[in-house]
């Protein structure tokens, strides 16, 4: 990836959105005309509740669907048939049995996208978006096909649609931050799963244009539930960073809830900026939408 992307005409005069989608959660960020930075949709207006459970539920006694936390709560009460794993099921083109009826997994994914995109409506109607970028954990032909087909059912005729991986989303997020945050390497620690996943952003400023790289790695030994998790995370960070000049670290994912990583945090904060949050990927996708990408879904 090259920083010439940054020099393209941005879509600053139009509304854009970034949508991070996994089997577990969805998240939506948007940017309105003239605004410098994306904002993220929260399920609660007075809280930073950005993660939308990627769930659908159909009531057992009527043909009525709910999504997200409502589906989660209704399932706990035994009121709905719950459908999860929407992205993977759609990628596999599965037929999903719900309450004795079969449904297309792509159609179910499209329904979930429609319901979640409706959260944007009070701010900007989805059909008025200039560009919409989806960020997924891994880009593949089945995922591309599933998202393309599901989005195609939404009728977003005016929006340019894109699909990127999380590494590319991280790239766009970085280059849209103040340059002092990425003048050296940038590390992202993602603990949203059962083990740690890292992305390391580096920029070779000796080339023209500047060449940027994102190196991904899984650290399965840094797993949720370990009694010595702080020590294990600390040793992993020391090994990964080594003699690199890392100027900034992002900690994202529900695995970083609580205070279990105090020793690791003390190490990471030594001459580095450290940020804790969980909406980086959707913001990165939104920044990508503003940058005027070139690889369309359709």
Outline where the language-model segments fall.
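Early-domain small/polar-rich strand-loop-helix modules and first-structured segments
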Residues: 1-95, 152, 160-164, 169-172
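A short acidic Gly-Thr/Ser loop motif
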Residues: 12, 18-25, 180-197, 202-204, ...
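A short acidic (Asp/Glu
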Residues: 28-29, 142-147, 172-175, 196-201, ...
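Conserved phosphate-binding loops in N-terminal lobes of ATP-dependent enzymes
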Residues: 42-135, 218-239, 244-246
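Glycine-rich phosphate-binding loops at beta-strand->alpha-helix junctions
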Residues: 132-143, 238-265
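Small-residue (GG/TT-enriched) beta-loop-alpha framework at ligand/catalytic clefts
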Residues: 134, 149-232
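Conserved phosphate-binding/catalytic loops in two-lobed NTP-binding clefts
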Residues: 156-169, 263-287
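Acidic, glycine/GT-rich loop-and beta-edge segments that sit at the periphery of enzyme/chaperone cores
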Residues: 280, 287-298
């Amino acid at each position: 990836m090259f920083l010439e992307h940054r020099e393209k005409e941005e879509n600053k005069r139009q509304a854009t959105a970034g949508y991070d989608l996994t089997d577990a959660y969805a998240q939506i960020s948007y940017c309105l005309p003239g605004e410098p930075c994306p904002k993220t949709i929260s399920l609660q207006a007075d809280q930073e509740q950005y993660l939308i459970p990627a769930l659908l539920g159909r009531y057992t006694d009527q043909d009525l669907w709910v999504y997200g936390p409502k589906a989660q709560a209704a399932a706990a009460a035994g009121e709905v048939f719950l459908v999860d794993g929407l992205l993977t099921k759609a990628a596999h083109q599965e037929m999903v049995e719900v309450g004795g009826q079969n449904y297309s997994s792509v159609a179910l994914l499209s329904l979930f996208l429609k319901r979640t995109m409706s959260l944007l409506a009070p701010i900007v109607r989805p059909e008025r978006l200039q560009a919409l970028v989806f960020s997924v954990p891994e880009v593949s032909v089945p995922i591309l096909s599933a998202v393309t087909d599901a989005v195609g059912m939404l009728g977003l005729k005016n929006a340019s649609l894109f699909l990127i991986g999380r590494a590319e989303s991280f790239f766009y997020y970085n280059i849209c931050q103040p340059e002092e945050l990425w003048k050296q390497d940038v590390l992202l620690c993602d603990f949203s799963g059962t083990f740690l996943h890292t992305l390391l952003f580096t920029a070779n400023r000796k080339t023209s244009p500047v060449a940027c790289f994102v190196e991904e790695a899984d650290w399965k030994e840094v797993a949720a539930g370990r009694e010595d998790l702080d020590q294990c995370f600390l040793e992993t960070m020391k090994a990964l960073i080594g003699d690199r000049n890392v100027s900034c670290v992002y900690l994202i994912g529900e695995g970083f809830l609580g205070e279990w990583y105090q020793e690791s945090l003390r190490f990471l904060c030594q001459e580095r900026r450290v940020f804790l949050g969980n909406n980086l990927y959707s913001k990165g996708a939104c920044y990508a939408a503003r940058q005027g990408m070139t690889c369309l879904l359709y």
